[in-house]
Amino acid sequence: MKIGVIGAGSWGTALANVVAANGHDTTLWAYEPELVTGMAATRVNHLFLPGIELHPGLNYTGALAEAVSGAELVLLVTPTQVMRNLLADLAGSIAPTAILASASKGIELGTLCTVSQICCQVLGDAVRERFVALSGPTFAKEVALGLPSLIVAGSANDAAAHTVQAAFSNPVFRVYTSDDAIGVELGGAVKNVIAIAAGISDGLGFGHNTRAALITRGLAEMKRLGRAMGAQDATFAGLAGMGDLVLTCTGDLSRNRTVGVKLGQGLTLEVIMAEMRMVAEGVKSAESVNALAQKLGVEMPITQKVYEILYGNKPARQAVLELMSRDLKPEQA
């Protein structure tokens, strides 16, 4: 199968490496010209995945049209906030029968659209039947190192989901399918916001009890938003929900948790972001997910407090204490 991967950050590079190692004709597009040149010369992504040699069959390009020309599967792995403009540039080059998959995890600012909704708006509603959301508890570095990992491919089209499953699966990378694309997308977006909250708690030194509570109540927020968007509760109990949430809230490789830890330790967002080369999607998602929750009338208090810390200059300790002093009520999923 001919596959084009758009986005050579750590996650895009790791996924491109998986399908190339599986024997597929794979081309990875990178925005940075020096990254294309460097990967072609050394087979290492020195910017985003240093120290890991990539499969010799993986091809590299800085030309979008070249990356997707003749591709039967196009995988989008860029920050959500640049997705719309990128798709507009790709529109004339993607084959009308190509499966369009996304491993990006976020909600677009302003429009409050998921990636699938952006794809339909830019490329036409027919894309919905060819769209697959790819998400799960996976750190790019561990996938690139060949450590056993599991992920889920969600699509309204069972055949499209199974095509992606077959393309990516191997003895150390197992792919499940789901018919709940919107649930898979939302799980990936919301968990990044909750991971910032968990990191803030850790940075404040609040301990394991607090983190466990944030993860559990964060899952409840994820499910409430999912119901309002037409997702299935079961999705959030699986790899794209609880699985990814636990990993991102506890793993030291989590960029979003790292942002939270530093916020809890007293650093400003500006200083934190200036130190980071790679994107922490949760910073933008806190704004868009909070706005989406307000638009749909969904109660998401943890998400709201993360938003207030990031964009309202609310002290982190005060935000956590405000969560603890909310009206007492029965536990609701």
Swiss-Prot record:
Gene3D superfamilies: N-(1-d-carboxylethyl)-l-norvaline Dehydrogenase, domain 2, NAD(P)-binding Rossmann-like Domain
Cellular component terms per the entry's GO annotation: cytosol
InterPro entries in UniProt: 6-PGluconate_DH-like_C_sf (IPR008927), 6PGD_dom2 (IPR013328), G3P_DH_NAD-dep (IPR006168), G3P_DH_NAD-dep_C (IPR006109), G3P_DH_NAD-dep_N (IPR011128), NAD(P)-bd_dom_sf (IPR036291)
Pathway: Membrane lipid metabolism; glycerophospholipid metabolism
GO biological process: carbohydrate metabolic process; glycerol-3-phosphate biosynthetic process; glycerol-3-phosphate catabolic process; glycerophospholipid metabolic process; phospholipid biosynthetic process
Compartments it resides in: Cytoplasm
Keywords: Cytoplasm, Lipid biosynthesis, Lipid metabolism, NAD, NADP, Nucleotide-binding, Oxidoreductase, Phospholipid biosynthesis, Phospholipid metabolism
Residues binding NADPH, per UniProt: S10, W11, K105, A140, R255, V279, E281
Active site, UniProt feature: K191
Catalytic activity: sn-glycerol 3-phosphate + NAD(+) = dihydroxyacetone phosphate + NADH + H(+); sn-glycerol 3-phosphate + NADP(+) = dihydroxyacetone phosphate + NADPH + H(+)
GO molecular function, one term: NAD binding
Role of this protein: Catalyzes the reduction of the glycolytic intermediate dihydroxyacetone phosphate (DHAP) to sn-glycerol 3-phosphate (G3P), the key precursor for phospholipid synthesis.
Protein known as: Glycerol-3-phosphate dehydrogenase [NAD(P)+]
Lineage: Bacteria, Pseudomonadati, Thermodesulfobacteriota, Desulfuromonadia, Geobacterales
